[in-house]
Amino acid sequence: METSFKQTTSNKVERYRLFLPQFELLISDEKEEISVLANTAAALREAFGFFWVGFYLVKDDQLILGPFQGSTACYRIHKGKGVCGTSWAEARTLIVPNVEQFPGHIACSSLSRSEIVVPILACLLYTS
């Protein structure tokens, strides 16, 4: 299976419109959650050129680094710490245009300037 998610249009709405059906096809038959997360990160980064895309998985009271695409990342983030830990603790999406203005920001990479964190609080990828 060879799939390219590179986009040629600069229109953001059009890019998402083109991405979604292709992405749904990519993950439609896969049952392994880690594999789906890995390809999700790769597809999003390729399609939109994001600096870093990835997942942290909950283990006890920490977020543990999961599948990602981009530069190296922090292995563990405690609940309520940094943008990711705060998003998880508050159960809400956080959009941070300037990470240097976010109290308690964890600088995993000095190249990262902004973050969008979407907590996936309960997820069942497939039922059978």
Where in this protein do the model-derived segments appear?
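Conserved small/polar residues in nucleotide/adenosyl-binding loops
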Residues: 126-127
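Short loop/turn motifs at secondary-structure junctions and domain boundaries
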Residues: 47, 106-113
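Intrinsically disordered, low-complexity terminal regulatory regions
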Residues: 1-69
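Regulatory sensory and allosteric helical modules in signal-transduction proteins
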Residues: 58-108
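Short glycine-rich loop/turn motifs
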Residues: 52, 113-114
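Short hydrophobic beta-strand micro-motif common in sensory/regulatory domains
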Residues: 114-121
